[in-house]
């Protein structure tokens, strides 16, 4: 399916690009999330009329994400979980737990924005986690997992 992108999409293209994607990806993700529209002649003409407005909105989102990223980058947060004497956690710290921790600290972060390269945290200690605030703004935070010996 040919679509026109209404915002920058990672690994796909930038605002205004006309790309071919699988039908399911377009119908189930891009179009419902208002990231794209079908590339009909009418949609392309309407996009060209609204291009400046959409570029302004995209620039505002990027600026807001960069401002939050500057505050968040390099910060350290602590989370306490039950653990055994060997330092392994009972359960794990997931991206949802990290997102909730960041929300409590005053940052508006969804769990899909939290990237954990090593997977869920299963040991006590300091771990680096990435937060993708925007496709162009990815910051590193440190999560210090403290063991609560049961």
UniProtKB/Swiss-Prot annotation:
Q: What is this protein called?
A: Large ribosomal subunit protein bL9
Q: Which GO terms describe its biological process?
A: translation
Keyword rRNA-binding present in the record's keywords: the answer is yes
The protein's organism comes out as Burkholderia cenocepacia (strain HI2424)
Which GO molecular function annotation, any one, does this entry have?
A: rRNA binding
Give the family, as the similarity comment puts it: Belongs to the bacterial ribosomal protein bL9 family.
HAMAP family reported for this sequence: Ribosomal_bL9
PANTHER family with a match to the protein in the record:
50S RIBOSOMAL PROTEIN L9
Keywords attached to this entry: Ribonucleoprotein, Ribosomal protein, RNA-binding, rRNA-binding
- Quote the cellular component terms of the Gene Ontology held in the record: ribonucleoprotein complex; ribosome
Report the NCBIfam families cross-referenced here.
L9
Among its keywords, does the record have rRNA-binding? yes
Q: Its function?
A: Binds to the 23S rRNA.
């Amino acid at each position: 399916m040919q679509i026109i992108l209404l915002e920058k999409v990672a690994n796909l293209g930038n605002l205004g690009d006309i790309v071919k994607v699988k039908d399911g990806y377009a119908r189930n993700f891009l179009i419902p999330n208002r990231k794209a529209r079908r590339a009909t002649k009418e949609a392309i003409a309407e996009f060209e009329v609204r291009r400046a407005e959409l570029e302004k909105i995209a620039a505002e989102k990027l600026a807001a994400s960069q401002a939050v990223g500057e505050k968040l980058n390099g910060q350290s947060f602590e989370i306490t979980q039950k653990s055994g004497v060997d330092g392994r956690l009972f359960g794990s710290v997931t991206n949802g737990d990290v997102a909730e921790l960041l929300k409590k600290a005053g940052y508006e972060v969804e769990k899909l924005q939290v990237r954990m390269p090593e997977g869920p945290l299963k040991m006590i200690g300091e771990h680096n986690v990435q937060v993708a605030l925007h496709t162009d703004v990815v910051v590193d935070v440190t999560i210090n997992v403290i063991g609560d010996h049961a």
